[in-house]
């Protein structure tokens, strides 16, 4: 099952990657888990900046400052508590709420494939060769990971053609096939690079022009193959001579670069393409030496562990297959040139013993162009060409095939095998239409099939081996069990078999017909005037009947169709379309694969129906076939003949009787020989099928154990990752707690220091102001106080401005720093989360596949058991159900009667009881309501009187207290002012006297200095005017900058709020999309499971139908054989 098929790309290299450890965290995110809100200090200062700038006292002088600050932080915490979002920490916790508990310990498995397979025997045919892929792998700049590769890989033309096989990987199951590297695309060189061939050339192997390598052709003499047919009575032989293409001498050779995927790909660049047999005659061995890649393939460095080797192989294989599909296109398999064959008239008297018989099968559809040649047979003693004069034998492959399929061929051939004539030597020649004659044939395919026939002793007639015996006598190694990856491969094997196996059957049947025809010619040379004309007329009639019957029939295909060939046909359809699916659309790939499997089932049924010949003649017609009695002479005619004519006729009839007796004897021997060969072939087929089943079972068990090793390793990795994640979350929580504790202590310390500083400044301000008030007089008290208030307000605003700028700078620095840390933490958590989700998904997929296989196995076992139990249980339950129904009906009637009586009595009692309770409840409610109204009126009047008296008393006491305090302070102040005024008056008088004397002395000096000062004053006045103008300009600029600053602050606040809102929306959208994706994935997996069950059921039904058709055909063949035997007996008797 191709689940992903590319779906199991697990990057184990991420386990080796070190994860960053963060020792610092944002103070804002520690106090508030939501990362999208501004720090509280910024909001607090923004709120404070909105207050009035003309306060009379500092804000710390307010005794409610501390309480308001604490209340602000509490309200901010409560207000942000409802808007908290899930952090990366909480997201990891939610992902790993229920980790998978594993009882085993985390142990290091350096080589899981070898340790898991150590309990099983490994055959030489099971995955011993290394997988060879030519991949240019670029190395990353930051992380040297082998999990991703570039799509622009440099591949040579030879490497592109050698890498069409899919690898064996943990996520996909596939069959391998023999490599088709010989089918090169030569369509580009048809016009200018094609060789000039002669019109008629000597027969022999015709090879395609190779554009990749220069292959020397072998000696034609060594490739000439002939088959000798002898007779039992004479020493003569029939020589059928042909030529064959060279075949790899090794039985296990598939000439394929395909091998198992268990070994590392480090050997791929060195070994390149090489045949497994190392034979000098193998065409792949010669061609592989000439192919040179356009770019050198770098060798991969050694990975730290075998798991990385396995994943690296997988990635290389997947990328390589995609690159090959992109380079090959859609018309690679359709542009193969047809092998041209020419008719050569030659004669060779040599008699060589050869073992191989080959035939080139042309699949061109133009039948008129094919029927141009004829098969010529030349006897030794007579130069006449009997076959050419009388149209004795069919000359075309289609006619020969139709002739071999006739129902009466065996009867005629058995009567013609007479060995009493001199030896006859003939040659079998081929006549096939050249490839250049028909333009349509240039886009079709031509295959070459090879069959081996063991040599027979001299002097005895040897029968050509049929395709059934060839298939039964094939060794198990020829099935390429070491190349089998799994049971659902999609290759071209079915198409290959459908084109070549009918060719083998046609070849064998044509060989039998040719042998029979040659023997008939040898036996009838002396008696051509009597028997020869009758035989020729019978053969002509049979040919005409067969042409009418089999005109609409196609080429018959094999009836023994298996599951892997149908799957390969489906893959051929997908490859010819040339569509390379992306690695992301795995679900669509799986559905397309299932559709191809179902279409292959339907196509197989249709081909089987078409391949079954629908004979127009029934068995009854064969039995009741009328005898030819028109030529039997009458008795009166015989009596009128002379004696010498009667004697001559008696001699002819005696010779005819001898011929028929010899034919009957040879037919019996042939029947015995066929029976023995059939029994031997059946036994060999059973033994080979059992051996193949054992080997396949062994191979599949090894594949399952290897996949189980992968799954166990992934589970161990998941367990270690879960432990690391848990440790990381614990460490983050401890760091969170430490930072929160530190933040609380720092806040408390700063609060205490600010409160102490404000208290000291307030006391200093109070002392300075009291001192100034004492120095002032009563008259200038109000003006001085207003001045002091203005100065204090100006100082307060300057301090606020400086403090605000300092705080904003510090907060901006902290914000940038914390945002950087936050983004780095978020990125690392997102990467870890993606890696964990990917590994979880792969582990779930693997576990689902294993559970699906187990359920399929247990379903078949439980089905039979459950059906039996269900039948028994159904009978027992039906009997019990009838008894219970009868009892239940009786009980039900009694219960209904009792229930009706009890219900009427209960209704009556309940009505009485409800009436009494309602009256009692109404009385009680009325009394309670009246009592409540009276109590409430009394309490209301008392409470109003009490509150009024208490309020009046409090107001009087407060009014009297503040009046007395005001009078006392005013008296003290007046007394203090009067004493200060007297003292200041005395001091002023003394000071005035001293200064008067001093000023009189200085007046003279001042007048002299006055002139110079006036000049300086004029200059200073000009400078002052300039300074005033500059001050006004500066003030205007300051106002403009303040307006711009307020506008910028407002815009910044709006932008921050918009950013927070967008983050919230994006997070909500991501969560909703994740939920939708999870639901869609679950639905797809359910649909996929149902579809897989339907496909498997469809395949089982197809196999059953094909088995039924095969059995019906076998029965029909037996019946036809019985009819033919009966006809032989009747004919011999007559």
From Swiss-Prot:
One of its GO terms (cellular component) is centriolar satellite. It is found in: Cytoplasm, Cytoskeleton, Microtubule organizing center, Centrosome; Cytoplasm, Cytoskeleton, Cilium basal body; Cytoplasm, Cytoskeleton, Microtubule organizing center, Centrosome, Centriole. Disulfide bonds: none annotated. Expressed in chordotonal (Ch) neuronal precursors. Expressed in ciliated cells, like sensory neurons and spermatids. Residues 513-522 have a biased composition (Polar residues). Disruption phenotype: Displays reduced climbing ability and die very soon after eclosion. Loss of protein expression leads to truncated sensory cilia formation and impaired intraflagellar transport processes. Simultaneous knockout of Cby and dila results in lack of motor coordination and absence of cilia in chordotonal neurons where centrioles fail to build a transition zone and Cep290 and Mks1 are mis-localized. Residues 180-196, 494-504 have a biased composition (Basic and acidic residues). Residues 111-131, 168-208, 286-306, 425-455, 492-528 are annotated as: Disordered. It comes from the Eukaryota. The keyword Nucleotide-binding does not apply. The keyword Repressor does not apply. InterPro entries: CEP131. Residues 732-1131 form a coiled coil. Keywords: Cell projection, Cilium biogenesis/degradation, Coiled coil, Cytoplasm, Cytoskeleton, Differentiation. Its main location: cytoplasm. One of its GO terms (biological process) is ciliary basal body-plasma membrane docking. Cilium-specific protein with a role in cilium/flagellum formation. May be involved in transport of components into the growing cilium. In germ cells and sensory neurons, plays a role with Cby in the building of the transition zone necessary for the formation of the ciliary cap and for the correct elongation of the axoneme. Belongs to the CEP131 family. This is Centrosomal protein of 131 kDa.
